[in-house]
């Protein structure tokens, strides 16, 4: 069995360099919610050094609230902003001898695109316009995954090690209780259940079906590195290969 392990990087966390030794894919902030040109360049350099797949992590224009503010923007605006961000990272990667492999939206752009078909279409269209060979990463079973498939893109369905789930397979909003799983054992058990059995127990007790092709590790948690190491060790014990 194989699984991709991804982390959001270039967002000002001190653990970026170490996380890049543990993950197989890196989602690099493109300046709209965090990061800048030099940080993007540094992240790409480290990803290439560690053999980690390079991906763009575009966001709504929201540095003030780290890309977590809900926005209602016209689809054409989202299309242009997404194209702008992924184009910038693709060029930075190419300038250093690397290749951008995937795109994963950030924060509220990701969450809204999981449910809003027009927004999902704008993102998928931008990815396709930039490079039809790019992989589009989105929440398992979401509108974004459906939009990607409609454009003929390779999609990668994502699950979260440290996030609570609702009965419909969507994430518990960060503003609600149960959104984040602080208990390491619970997060490990949830991850294995999703990867090995394709299901997750919701905060209300029902089982939701999920397709786990990539697991997100948040690099901004207090114990992010320790958990990443434990997860890698657990995958090795279960003979689950980590690869992009």
Swiss-Prot record:
Descriptive protein name: 5-oxoprolinase subunit A
Q: Which organism is it from?
A: Shigella sonnei (strain Ss046)
**Family label:** Belongs to the LamB/PxpA family.
One GO term of the biological process aspect? carbohydrate metabolic process
Q: Which keywords does UniProt give here?
A: ATP-binding, Hydrolase, Nucleotide-binding
Reactions catalysed, semicolon-separated, are: 5-oxo-L-proline + ATP + 2 H2O = L-glutamate + ADP + phosphate + H(+)
Quaternary structure? Forms a complex composed of PxpA, PxpB and PxpC.
InterPro entries assigned: Glyco_hydro/deAcase_b/a-brl (IPR011330), LamB/YcsF/PxpA-like (IPR005501)
| Function, as annotated | Catalyzes the cleavage of 5-oxoproline to form L-glutamate coupled to the hydrolysis of ATP to ADP and inorganic phosphate.
- EC class of this enzyme? hydrolase
Q: Which GO terms describe its molecular function?
A: 5-oxoprolinase (ATP-hydrolyzing) activity; ATP binding
Q: What Gene3D superfamilies does this protein's entry cite?
A: Glycoside hydrolase/deacetylase
EC annotation? 3.5.2.9
């Amino acid at each position: 069995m194989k699984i991709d392990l991804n982390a959001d990087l270039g967002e000002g966390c001190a653990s970026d360099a170490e996380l890049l030794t543990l993950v197989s894919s890196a989602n690099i902030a493109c300046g709209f919610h965090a990061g800048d040109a030099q940080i993007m360049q540094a992240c790409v350099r480290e990803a290439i050094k560690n053999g980690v797949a390079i991906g763009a992590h575009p966001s709504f224009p929201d540095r003030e609230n780290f890309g977590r503010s809900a926005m209602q923007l016209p689809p054409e605006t989202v299309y242009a902003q997404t194209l702008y961000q992924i184009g910038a990272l693709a060029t930075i990667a190419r300038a250093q001898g690397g290749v951008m492999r995937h795109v994963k939206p950030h924060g509220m752009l990701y969450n809204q695109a999981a449910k809003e078909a027009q927004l999902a279409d704008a993102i998928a269209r931008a990815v396709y316009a930039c490079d039809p060979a790019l992989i589009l990463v989105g929440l398992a079973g979401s509108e974004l995954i459906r939009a990607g498939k409609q454009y003929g893109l390779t999609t990668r369905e994502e699950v979260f090690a440290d996030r609570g789930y609702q009965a419909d397979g969507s994430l518990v909003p960060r503003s609600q209780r149960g959104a984040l799983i602080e208990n390491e054992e619970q997060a490990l058990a949830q991850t294995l259940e999703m990867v090995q059995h394709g299901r997750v127990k919701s905060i209300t007790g029902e089982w939701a079906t999920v397709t786990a092709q990539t697991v997100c590790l948040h690099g901004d948690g207090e114990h992010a590195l320790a958990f990443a190491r434990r997860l890698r060790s657990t995958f090795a014990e279960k003979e689950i290969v980590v690869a992009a």
